[in-house]
Regions:
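Conserved functional hotspot residues or short segments at active or partner-binding sites
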Residues: 129
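Non-catalytic terminal/interface segments that mediate subunit docking, oligomerization
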Residues: 30, 40, 76-77, 87
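Short, hydrophobic/aromatic alpha-helical segments in well-folded domains
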Residues: 84-86, 113-116
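Catalytic core of membrane glycerolipid acyltransferases/transacylases, capturing the structured
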Residues: 79-100
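Glycine/small-residue-rich phosphate/adenosyl-binding loop
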Residues: 70-72
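Divalent-metal-activated hydrolytic enzyme cores
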Residues: 1-68, 93-94, 103-112, 119-124, ...
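Short glycine-enriched loops at secondary-structure junctions
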Residues: 76-83, 102-105, 132-135
Length: 267
């Protein structure tokens, strides 16, 4: 990114902002994918970014002078400070209804917020779960699995334990997938812990999407934000692919996804 420039210009009154009201869940996925791709390219070459006032929450308002809330997608993401979700998905104010929690876990309070979006925001066409690489919450769950003595400090902190416990199923699932793909000797690899964090993040993100789609009865997508590439995507049998995927429909589909991803990770 060295040497690249980014110029920001306020456009003022230049007409109405572009219409971003997708008709379907797939249209919403396309908008998120294009926004993610644009963010990934940010800084790679000189870029001029023109901001319409509506992009920051200023624009046509109701009679009371306040914008109506009309997001096209509701997103559950991690609270990691390195992943500002509207920016990473290339979206502006009033385009995403965002719920953030460490580990992007589907606890009752988070699901309640998403239930609100489903019931009261008809503009929402898609629900999405976004995890990210090197997630601290997932790493804590991995360490608790590989080194049970480290769980003792977590066990005495009820709220933190609730988050970590929510991630353990995905960690165990990912660990079994790695052993299936690479054999029992995989645990001796110096890269095993890092690969387990990577795969557990995918497993938990996909599992959360499956759970939410069943819970809400609405289309749900998922993806993992890769910090090194500044892009949301999904790991497949041949590596990381930019772009969201729709939630697995059943346990067989998520098992196939995680097993394929496990085989793509070198140990």
């Amino acid at each position: 990114m060295a040497g690249a420039t980014l110029s920001l210009h306020w456009t003022g009154e230049t007409g109405p902002p572009p219409v971003r009201t997708p008709d379907t869940a797939q249209d919403a996925v396309t908008l998120l994918d294009s926004g993610s791709q644009a963010f990934a390219q940010l800084g790679s070459e000189p870029l001029e970014w023109r901001l319409d006032p509506a992009a920051l929450g200023f624009g046509p308002a109701d009679n009371d002078g306040v914008l109506s809330q009309e997001p096209f997608a509701a997103v559950l993401s991690c609270s990691d400070a390195r992943v500002p979700i509207e920016l990473t998905l290339g979206q502006a104010a009033n385009e995403l209804f965002v719920v953030r929690v460490a580990g992007n876990v589907t606890g009752a309070v988070c699901r309640g917020s998403l239930h609100y979006a489903a019931a009261h925001l008809p503009s929402v066409k898609l629900f999405a779960v976004v995890g990210h690489s090197r997630c601290g919450a997932t790493t804590a769950a991995v360490d608790a699995t590989l080194h049970p003595d480290k769980y003792l400090a977590i066990a005495t902190d009820g709220p933190l334990r609730e988050i970590v416990d929510s991630l353990l199923a995905g960690v165990n699932f990912a660990q079994r997938a790695l052993l299936h793909a690479h054999g029992a000797a995989a645990v001796d690899s110096p890269h095993f812990r890092a690969r387990l964090v990577t795969l557990a993040t995918l497993a938990n993100t996909a599992l959360s999407a499956l759970v939410l789609e069943r819970d809400l009865g609405r289309p749900c997508a998922f993806g993992v934000y890769k910090l090194s590439e500044r892009s949301v995507g999904v790991r497949r049998a041949d590596g990381f692919h930019p772009g969201f995927a729709m939630a697995p429909k059943d346990e067989d589909e998520i098992t196939s996804l995680v097993l394929a991803a496990a085989g793509s990770l070198e140990l």
